[in-house]
């Protein structure tokens, strides 16, 4: 997207979510202008020096925020909703917030392995007992962090489940599909 926008002579600025802030009801970011892009190099972006920009004056903002879907993620979506209507936010902030990926895919549950989303430990244990082998992970996690393969006889079964539930969010438990490693 950046490559095509540069070809069309758009000015592109990038910033991280940590660098987005609201000051006196004006949305700003600590950002850098992209000067060049070379996807064949390890350091593929050439940037100007980072500086504070007022996002109210931009025509488009493209949200490309990776999970985890946490309070920082949610806050960023609320902040981006402060932009004036004259600024088009692509990947609408409220739509992103309202459609977390692991819940949204439940619209296609008929294409998924048996799945449980819960914080109720006895329901989770019953699900594990029923399917023998499962994968359990935080509902709003990312990058493979805190993903566990469990079987009903795992000596650490309860400890792992309790540890995941101690983080105050639901978990997603799915029947383990052996062929998953083949895509």
Question: Which role fits each region the language model picked out?
Answer:
Residues 1-117:
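Conserved N-proximal alpha/beta basic substrate-recognition cap immediately N-terminal to
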Residues 18, 30, 71-73, 108, ...:
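Aromatic-residue detector
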Residues 39, 138-140:
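Short acidic, glycine-rich loop/turn motifs
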Residues 50-52, 105-106, 123-126, 161-162:
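Short, flexible, glycine/charge-rich loop motifs used to bind or transfer phosphoryl groups or to couple energy/partner
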Residues 121-122, 129-133, 140-183:
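Phosphate-binding site of ATP-dependent enzymes
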């Amino acid at each position: 997207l950046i490559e095509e926008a540069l070809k069309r002579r758009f000015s592109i600025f990038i910033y991280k979510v940590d660098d987005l802030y609201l000051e006196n009801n004006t949305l700003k970011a600590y950002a850098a202008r992209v000067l060049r892009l070379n996807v064949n190099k390890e350091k593929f972006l050439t940037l100007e020096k980072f500086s504070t920009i007022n996002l109210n004056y931009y025509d488009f903002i493209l949200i490309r925020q990776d999970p985890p879907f946490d309070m920082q993620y949610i806050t960023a979506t609320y902040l981006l909703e402060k932009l004036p209507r004259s600024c088009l936010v692509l990947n609408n902030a409220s739509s992103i917030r309202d459609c977390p990926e692991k819940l949204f895919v439940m619209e296609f549950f008929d294409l998924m392995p048996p799945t449980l989303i819960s914080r109720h430990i006895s329901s989770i244990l019953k699900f594990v007992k029923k399917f023998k082998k499962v994968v359990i992970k935080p509902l709003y996690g990312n990058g493979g962090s805190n993903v566990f393969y469990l079987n009903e006889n795992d000596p650490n079964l309860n400890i792992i489940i309790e540890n995941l539930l101690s983080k105050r969010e639901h978990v997603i438990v799915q029947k383990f599909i052996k062929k998953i490693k083949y895509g």
